[in-house]
A protein has these predicted regions:
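A glycine-rich helix N-cap at a beta->alpha junction
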Residues: 55-74
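Small/aliphatic-rich secondary-structure junction motif
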Residues: 2-54, 63, 120
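A short acidic, often aromatic-flanked loop/helix-cap motif at beta-alpha or helix-coil junctions
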Residues: 73-80, 127-131
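Short acidic active-site motifs
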Residues: 52, 76-82, 108
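Gly/Ser-rich helix-loop-strand patches that form or flank binding pockets
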Residues: 85-131
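Structural motif
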Residues: 13-17, 43-46, 71, 95-99, ...
Length: 131
C-alpha cells in the first residue's frame, strides 16, 4: 500500500543498539507531514530488527502506514547516500546522528553526506557534556 499521487519515501536508517524513540518518532512525523511511505534499513547482527523497534512497527501496521523493512549486517554512509541519490522518490534520510555513523566509517576522511541530494534529518538526543 502506498500513498496516492506522487510517491515520496522517507528513508530511515537504524543502527542496532542505537534505537531511540525520538529517531523513530521523527521519521513517523515526517512521513505524516509529507504523506510519504517509510523505508526502513536496519543494521543488525541477526535477521530480525531489534526488539526495541517492535512497538514502532506495530504502530505503523495499526495506522496502515506504508512501509518496507530490510535488515542488513552492514550499511555504510556512502551506501545510504548512493541509494538515496539513485532513487528520486526518497524525500529525506533520517538517522540518529552524523557522529554515530562516523564511528562506523572505514574512511573518515570523506564526508558522503555532503553529496546527499535530499535533506538529512538527524534525530538523536544529544547528551549534555559536563565541564
Amino acid at each position: 500500500m502506498t500513498h496516492p499521487g506522487k510517491q515520496r519515501t522517507v528513508l530511515l536508517a537504524v543502527r542496532e543498539g542505537h534505537v531511540d524513540s525520538r529517531l523513530l518518532t521523527s521519521a513517523l512525523e515526517l512521513c505524516r507531514r509529507l504523506e510519504a511511505d517509510l523505508e526502513i534499513q536496519v543494521i543488525a547482527g541477526g535477521e530480525a530488527p531489534p526488539s526495541e523497534m517492535d512497538a514502532f512497527l506495530n504502530t505503523l501496521r495499526e495506522e496502515r502506514l506504508p512501509f518496507s523493512l530490510e535488515v542488513k549486517p552492514t550499511l555504510r554512509r556512502r551506501d545510504l547516500v548512493d541509494y538515496a541519490n539513485a532513487h528520486e522518490h526518497i524525500a529525506a534520510v533520517v538517522i540518529d546522528s552524523r557522529e554515530g555513523w562516523e564511528a562506523l566509517a572505514q574512511d573518515r576522511s570523506s564526508d558522503p553526506w555532503k553529496r546527499l541530494e535530499c535533506p538529512l534529518v538527524t534525530a538523536a538526543v544529544h547528551e549534555k557534556k559536563h565541564h
